[in-house]
UniProtKB/Swiss-Prot annotation:
The lineage of its organism: Eukaryota, Viridiplantae, Streptophyta, Embryophyta, Tracheophyta. It is found in: Plastid, Chloroplast. GO terms for cellular component: chloroplast. Signal peptide: none annotated. The keyword tRNA processing applies. One of its GO terms (molecular function) is RNA binding. Its main location: plastid. Keywords: Chloroplast, mRNA processing, Plastid, RNA-binding, tRNA processing. It comes from Vauquelinia californica (Arizona rosewood). It comes from the Eukaryota. This is Maturase K. Belongs to the intron maturase 2 family. MatK subfamily.
Length: 504
């Protein structure tokens, strides 16, 4: 996008919240859809000045388009045509281009917001693992937790109305409605969680969904700002993970004042709550009593239904005691367990013992769902016994080992924050033995014979980089090293949860 800034003067249009005139140029959508475009032509000195001109932009795009012809395969010949083009492909190109254009002002606001708050390493805040240190720090002081699924809008028009807060161009909104109607299956996308976050989902719909979530979370942001206990920068950052930084607060405050009397606002005077979200699932936790938590639930549901026009049922939001409830969140089973410690104190001739009970967040590997996932892709059976991967037997030995090592290291990397490593070691054992059985099947040999011939050094490939470095530093496993292996490690370079065999 930096290549276009000199020609489009984005700052001038950002001030007026208008999309620049390229929104209605057909060429930009074809270029946005084609990921194989040769970008080197943008680096050439074409001799254009920086003065804004539609003619200059059109000539520039025309020159780019001449090297990138649209080819429609013969397989699409039986589908509906639109002015000589495939209708579905044409609509998809339009949506991709529209999403790219709308994202530019948000990206500029993101950069300016990071510079204003002096956030240097903002990419660390995008990591999934950055949520767990926050939970470790806050959850031991809380009492109740509630799992909340993000409610979906009751109609696609709600998504358009939400985007209207940032896009003040009526023509662009009409074009957006046209694109929504072109996708005949988008109504099913609203109610299907797996399809929303699939890799094949249009980029435009993800943008609209994020704007909808921003509107939904603005109520919680208002409550957070009313609390004197949540003035830390760390908790505020997590509300900014959705990349909509300049959401105005007065619509939410106005709703509170108009829809609720002053007596009800007393319940929100000092809520002391925490909120985290990933994709369509969120966690709301607080230190209040069960009575206040239930009042929160009904008030928030009414606000979401009346203000954001989303359908949410109070009966599907369960409030659980944190000490007796296990959270299934981001692939971990998280729960609070007491950590007992005995302190011996002596004063003059008298000595006594003091028992300290501290709460600690316990993160466990979900062993049964993981074994089910491994069994689904034929690494083991339903009981967890390793089997050979028959579909990989035709590959080379190097490719087979590399695939297994890649999956094993990814799982070790992601579940390095587990409190108990026994379940993780079992998953590693399944993958190692499945790899050996696959190689033995390829060479028509038994596992024992194959290991004797190749040696047990094959299994060393499955060690992670951290384990290899520690084994070089500490040749003999000491007590300190074993204790370090049992400790939790959170990485700040994990941005998404991939499938087990997404590279297959």
């Amino acid at each position: 996008m930096e290549e276009f800034q000199g020609y489009l003067e984005l700052d001038r249009y950002q001030q007026h919240d208008f999309l620049y005139p390229l929104i209605f140029r057909e060429y930009i959508y074809a270029l946005a859809h084609d990921h194989g475009l040769n970008r080197s032509i943008l680096l050439d000195n074409v001799g254009y000045d920086t003065k804004y001109s539609l003619l200059i932009i059109k000539r520039l795009i025309s020159r780019m388009y001449q090297q990138n012809h649209l080819i429609i395969s013969a397989n699409d010949s039986n589908q509906n045509k639109f002015f000589g083009y495939n209708k579905n492909l044409y609509s998809q190109m339009m949506s991709e281009g529209f999403a790219v254009i709308v994202e530019i002002p948000f990206s500029l606001r993101l950069v300016s917001s990071l510079e204003a708050t002096e956030i240097v390493k903002s990419y660390n805040l995008r990591s999934i693992h950055s949520i767990f240190p926050f939970l470790e720090d806050k959850f031991p002081h809380l009492n109740y937790v509630s799992d909340v699924l993000i409610p979906y809008p009751i109609h696609l028009e709600i998504l358009v109305q939400t985007l209207r807060y940032w896009v003040k161009d009526p023509s662009s909104l009409h074009l957006l409605r046209l694109l929504l109607h072109e996708y005949y299956n988008w109504n099913s996308l609203i109610t299907t969680k797996k399809v929303i976050f699939s890799k094949s989902n249009p980029r435009l719909f993800l943008l609209l969904y994020n704007s909808h979530v921003c509107e939904y979370e603005s109520i919680l942001l208002f409550l957070r700002n009313q609390s004197s206990h949540l003035r830390l920068t760390s908790s505020g950052i997590f509300f900014e993970r959705i990349h909509f930084y300049e959401k105005k607060k007065y619509p939410v405050e106005e709703v509170f004042v108009n829809d609720f009397p002053a007596a009800i606002l007393w319940f929100f005077k000092d809520p002391f709550m925490h909120y985290v979200r990933y994709q369509g699932k969120s966690i709301l936790s607080s230190k209040d009593t069960p009575l206040l938590m239930n009042k929160w639930k009904y008030y928030l549901v009414n606000l979401w239904q009346c203000h954001s026009y989303v359908w949410s049922q109070p009966g599907r939001i369960y409030i659980n005691q944190l000490s007796k409830h296990s959270l299934d969140f981001l692939g971990y089973f998280s729960s609070m367990r007491p950590n007992l410690s005995v302190v011996r104190s002596q004063m003059l001739e008298n000595s006594f013992l003091m028992d300290n009970a501290m709460k600690k967040l316990d993160t466990l590997v979900p062993i049964i769902p993981l074994i089910g996932s491994l069994a689904k892709v034929k690494f083991c059976n339903a009981l967890g016994h390793p089997i050979s991967k028959s579909t990989w037997a035709d590959s080379s030995d190097f490719d087979i080992i590399d695939r297994f090592v890649h999956i094993c290291r990814n799982l070790s990397h992601y579940y390095s924050g587990s409190s108990r490593k026994k379940s993780l070691y079992r998953i590693k054992y399944i993958l190692r033995l499945s790899c050996v059985k696959t190689l033995a099947r390829k060479h028509k040999s038994t596992v024992r014979t194959f290991l004797k011939r190749l040696g047990y050094k094959l299994l060393d490939e499955f060690f992670t980089e951290e384990e290899q470095i520690l084994s070089l530093i500490f040749p003999r496993a000491s007590y300190t090293l074993k204790k370090f292996y049992r400790g939790r490690i959170w990485y700040l370079d994990i941005f998404c949860i991939n499938d087990l065999v997404n590279h297959e």
